[in-house]
């Protein structure tokens, strides 16, 4: 029987019941609230991440935009945690599901767009028609700008899904090759294992970078509408 490369991306079930919500809640359990007066290393790391994200993403926002600070910090920590969770053996990565990523991207994008239409409707409508556009091109440009606006959440979700899925497929392929070559040639198997180790380190970086890129783009959409 041939192995299905996408079997690891199928939503896991136990007795026909999806355990995806449990997997999504698991990262929150890792970052539990401290019960001591003195912070430990984990709390210090969390505070450092909060300060870094706040400095990098929220410094360009006005007062209305900074109201999203906690949401964006929660978003980047959630995406990074779920991406890293998928690198553990016998685990499932929720961010490889396009439906979940669309479920995150669409509400956040829609919230920024609605905020823009509420706070500065003239400026938001002006994006659909650049200044100085020739009259014959006005209908076509309005259609193009409208399509580009609605493509934003799709691009957010597809980018995250494609990058995480591609990395997991490469790890799966090279890991299977390493296991198959271990009984044929120890030298070649060692080389492929070294490649697998380096690729795993690269995927850790990709998991963190994709979480940062997703949150940064949401922050830029928010900045354009506040």
Swiss-Prot record:
Reactions catalysed, as given in the entry: H(+)(in) = H(+)(out)
Q: Which GO CC annotations does the UniProt entry carry?
A: mitochondrial inner membrane; proton-transporting ATP synthase complex
Q: Which domain of life is it from?
A: Eukaryota
Q: Does the keyword Membrane apply?
A: yes
- What is one Gene Ontology biological process annotated in the Swiss-Prot or TrEMBL record? proton motive force-driven ATP synthesis
User: Listed GO molecular functions?
Assistant: proton channel activity; proton-transporting ATP synthase activity, rotational mechanism
- Keyword terms, alphabetized: ATP synthesis, CF(0), Hydrogen ion transport, Ion transport, Membrane, Mitochondrion, Mitochondrion inner membrane, Transmembrane, Transmembrane helix, Transport
Q: Name one Pfam family in it.
A: ATP-synt_A
Q: How is this protein positioned relative to the membrane?
A: Multi-pass membrane protein
Which parts of the chain span the membrane according to its record?
14-34, 68-88, 97-117, 138-158, 164-184, 193-213
| Location relative to the cell | Mitochondrion inner membrane
SUPFAM superfamilies xrefs: F1F0 ATP synthase subunit A
Q: Which family does it belong to?
A: Belongs to the ATPase A chain family.
Q: How does it assemble?
A: Component of the ATP synthase complex composed at least of ATP5F1A/subunit alpha, ATP5F1B/subunit beta, ATP5MC1/subunit c (homooctomer), MT-ATP6/subunit a, MT-ATP8/subunit 8, ATP5ME/subunit e, ATP5MF/subunit f, ATP5MG/subunit g, ATP5MK/subunit k, ATP5MJ/subunit j, ATP5F1C/subunit gamma, ATP5F1D/subunit delta, ATP5F1E/subunit epsilon, ATP5PF/subunit F6, ATP5PB/subunit b, ATP5PD/subunit d, ATP5PO/subunit OSCP.
* NCBIfam families registered for this protein in UniProt: ATP_synt_6_or_A
Its biological purpose is as follows:
Subunit a, of the mitochondrial membrane ATP synthase complex (F(1)F(0) ATP synthase or Complex V) that produces ATP from ADP in the presence of a proton gradient across the membrane which is generated by electron transport complexes of the respiratory chain. ATP synthase complex consist of a soluble F(1) head domain - the catalytic core - and a membrane F(1) domain - the membrane proton channel. These two domains are linked by a central stalk rotating inside the F(1) region and a stationary peripheral stalk.
Q: What is this protein called?
A: ATP synthase F(0) complex subunit a
- The organism is Tachyglossus aculeatus aculeatus (Southeast Australian short-beaked echidna)
């Amino acid at each position: 029987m041939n192995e299905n490369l996408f079997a690891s991306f199928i939503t896991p079930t136990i007795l026909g019941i999806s355990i995806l919500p449990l997997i999504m809640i698991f990262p929150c359990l890792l970052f539990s609230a401290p019960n001591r007066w003195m912070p430990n290393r984990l709390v210090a790391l969390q505070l450092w991440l909060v300060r870094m994200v706040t400095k990098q993403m929220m410094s360009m926002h006005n007062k209305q935009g900074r109201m999203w600070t906690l949401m964006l910090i929660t978003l980047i920590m959630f995406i990074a945690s779920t991406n890293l969770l998928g690198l553990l053996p016998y685990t499932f990565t929720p961010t490889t599901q396009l439906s979940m990523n669309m479920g995150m991207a669409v509400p956040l994008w829609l919230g920024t767009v609605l905020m823009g239409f509420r706070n500065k409707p003239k400026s938001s409508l002006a994006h659909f028609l650049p200044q100085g556009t020739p009259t014959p091109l006005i209908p076509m440009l309005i259609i193009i700008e409208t399509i580009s606006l609605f493509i934003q959440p799709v691009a957010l979700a597809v980018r995250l899904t494609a990058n995480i899925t591609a990395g997991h497929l490469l790890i799966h392929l090279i890991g299977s090759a390493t296991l198959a070559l271990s009984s044929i040639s120890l030298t070649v198997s060692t080389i492929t294992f070294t490649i697998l180790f380096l690729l795993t380190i690269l995927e850790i970086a990709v998991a963190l970078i994709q979480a940062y890129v997703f949150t940064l783009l949401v922050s830029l959409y928010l900045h354009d509408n506040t």
